[in-house]
Amino acid sequence: MRAFIRIQHSGDFYDQNCYSVYHGCSKLDIPIVRYKAIYSVTDNAPTDLVVGAFSDVKVALERLGVNLLPIDYPDELLPFTGRKIWKSTLFTITSHPDYWHVFVKPVEDVKRFRGTILDKSEDLIKLGGGLEDIEVWCSEKVNFLAEWRIWILDGKIIGVNPYRGRWDLYPDPKVLQQAVNAYHSAPRAYALDFGITDKRETLLVEVSDAYALSSFGLDSVLYLSLIHISEPTRRRG
């Protein structure tokens, strides 16, 4: 195993995630290869790790014939969302103002725009300028005051990190464990994002495979283990 880690033109690591993987590799004596552009990486093997921007990881995996399938909202975990969630298309939502007042995010084309609230016509600019219709997730609005990432490896919670909102609001640990127990189709390495609402409910925000997630301060060796295990186990198209 080698770790291909992106660097800036200055020679510094591309971001905190890249440095975290470098730190973990240093502790475990895993050889690293620095790269500036993903197209210069031509000899990575399926057992190697590629770290960089989301697009870098996507290109590296697609070269190996790996089909990226977002998890988002598994059926087993829908009861933990506490709200209605459904699929639609971007043009369907944007062309019917009576469908607005929802949270919208792409199902697969995640670079098209970031998940956002659509309340008024001024919000349409946040949905990107693409001419192609895409599939989107729609969700009833929830007022999350704080959001936390829960890291899971082989069915066990190995880390919990805050990443948005108030520092003094914590998720209910019983709800977190119940969600892990209920997720029978889970991959080996993944993350659950949970939020605490203005009603002090602990609700699921979304589920993500670990292969391209930000570390959010997780121990570097644990972070390295999570993303390495998740990459080779992606489902193939």
Question: Model regions: which residues?
Answer:
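Acidic-residue sensor for enzyme active/binding pockets
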Residues: E147, E206, E231
